[in-house]
């Protein structure tokens, strides 16, 4: 879990737009966040396996 202070800091509007960065909406992780879902890869995988994300299915080829 991310530190609450860093999550709070990321939610504030930055002084300059380039300083903004994405964080996972579920756990607050700053790396490998999918913009479309707003989730990190770990949370995305957990929620997809649980069937909590409509339209997401495991691919096979």
UniProtKB/Swiss-Prot annotation:
One of its GO terms (biological process) is translation. It comes from the Bacteria. Keywords: Metal-binding, Ribonucleoprotein, Ribosomal protein, RNA-binding, rRNA-binding, Zinc. Binds 1 zinc ion per subunit. GO terms for cellular component: cytoplasm; small ribosomal subunit. InterPro entries: Ribosomal_uS14, Ribosomal_uS14_bact, Ribosomal_uS14_CS, Ribosomal_uS14_sf. Zn(2+) binds at residues 24, 27, 40, 43. Disulfide bonds: none annotated. One of its GO terms (molecular function) is rRNA binding. Its cofactor is Zn(2+). Part of the 30S ribosomal subunit. Contacts proteins S3 and S10. HAMAP family: Ribosomal_uS14_2_B. Binds 16S rRNA, required for the assembly of 30S particles and may also be responsible for determining the conformation of the 16S rRNA at the A site. Belongs to the universal ribosomal protein uS14 family. Zinc-binding uS14 subfamily. This is Small ribosomal subunit protein uS14B.
């Amino acid at each position: 879990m991310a530190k609450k202070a860093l999550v709070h800091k990321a939610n504030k509007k930055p002084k300059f737009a380039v300083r903004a960065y994405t964080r996972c909406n579920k756990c607050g992780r700053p790396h490998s966040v999918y913009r479309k879902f707003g989730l990190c890869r770990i949370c995305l995988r957990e929620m997809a396996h649980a069937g909590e994300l409509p339209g997401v299915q495991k691919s096979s080829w």
